[in-house]
Amino acid sequence: MAFTKSKQPRKQRKALFNAPLHLRRKVMSAMLSKELKEKLGKNAIPVRKGDVVRIMRGDFKGLEGEVIKVDLKRYRIYVEGANNKRQDGREVPYPIHPSNVMIIKLYDKDEKRFKHIKNE
């Protein structure tokens, strides 16, 4: 997926910031576990709400949980169990970049998604 043909970092960054939502989805890809790689024949696919992921980097490294929200505008996902405590004691979900997670189990209620993955 080429936003721009330029090699200049400033133009690459600008393309990311100004990308339309349908192209942002592609950037929100995460690597697949070994079993899923063999099954699907792909290294990475876009993350979706309902997928089960393992966090590979950061403070929550090793945590496995379901994706509860995908934020295309901020390029972040929210995983069940990855929470920060606010000053008043409330738990708030912690935003994680999809490059720092591995998809362990795909959301299986969407047949159309599997057909789309196979055709790519």
Curated annotation (Swiss-Prot):
Gene Ontology BP term (one): cytoplasmic translation
Keywords for the protein's UniProt record, in alphabetical order: Ribonucleoprotein, Ribosomal protein, RNA-binding, rRNA-binding
GO molecular function: RNA binding; rRNA binding; structural constituent of ribosome
Listed CDD domains: KOW_RPL26 (cd06089)
Transmembrane segments: none
Gene3D superfamilies tied to this protein: 2.30.30.30
SUPFAM superfamilies per UniProt: Translation proteins SH3-like domain
PROSITE patterns per record: RIBOSOMAL_L24
Pfam families reported in the protein's UniProt record: KOW (PF00467), Ribosomal_L26 (PF16906)
Family classification: Belongs to the universal ribosomal protein uL24 family.
Record's subunit section: Part of the 50S ribosomal subunit.
Entry function: One of two assembly initiator proteins, it binds directly to the 5'-end of the 23S rRNA, where it nucleates assembly of the 50S subunit.
Name by which UniProt lists this protein: Large ribosomal subunit protein uL24
UniProt source species: Methanocaldococcus jannaschii (strain ATCC 43067 / DSM 2661 / JAL-1 / JCM 10045 / NBRC 100440)
